């Protein structure tokens, strides 16, 4: 179970940056209004749906561990793209990839959590997984907001990508071995 909770924790702590910073990025960095912000989140949603449908195909050619690792790297690269972009098209591509990565990581780790424990503790294991996600969103979001306020949204997004790679990759290396 710990083999799935640690990657969930690492990914969500870093990935919470986009949830808190996108409402600021849309108007400040891209000059978008409410409809532009909605468009970026719609692209996230489209990416999530396509990502969900791609998981079975990915699992036919790669292990669950490799799928999660690839999606984690995709998220980090997508965040860097959003941070570096001054154009809506690039930010939309980044949010699309983020959506695909988000659902791939969380669905895969949730499935792994459920299948790694006996049936009599499955509900508790899923609950622990959900608590890890929610706790990281609750803790990570204000942390990324404070960093963005002290520096810049671009710096905070890039830092979250760096943190994801620094903390996430070692936890995923452990995950790959288990």
What is each residue range found by the language model?
Residues 1-6:
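Membrane-interface helix starts
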Residues 7-15, 19-178:
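C-terminal transmembrane bundle of multi-pass solute transporters/carriers
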């Amino acid at each position: 179970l710990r083999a799935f909770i640690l990657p969930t924790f690492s990914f969500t702590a870093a990935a919470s940056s986009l949830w808190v910073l996108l409402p600021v990025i849309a108007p400040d960095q891209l000059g978008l209004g409410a409809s532009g912000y909605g468009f970026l989140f719609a692209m996230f949603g489209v990416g999530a749906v396509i990502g969900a449908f791609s998981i079975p195909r990915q699992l036919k050619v790669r292990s669950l561990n490799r799928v999660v690792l690839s999606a984690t790297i995709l998220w980090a690269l997508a965040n860097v793209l959003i941070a570096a972009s001054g154009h809506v098209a690039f930010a939309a591509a980044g949010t699309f990839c983020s959506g695909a990565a988000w659902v791939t990581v969380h669905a895969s780790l949730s499935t792994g959590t459920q299948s790694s424990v006996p049936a009599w503790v499955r509900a508790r294991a899923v609950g622990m997984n959900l608590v890890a996600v929610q706790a990281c969103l609750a803790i990570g979001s204000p942390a990324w907001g404070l960093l963005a306020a002290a520096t810049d949204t671009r710096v905070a997004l890039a830092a979250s990508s760096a943190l994801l790679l620094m903390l996430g990759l070692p936890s995923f290396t452990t995950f790959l071995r288990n």
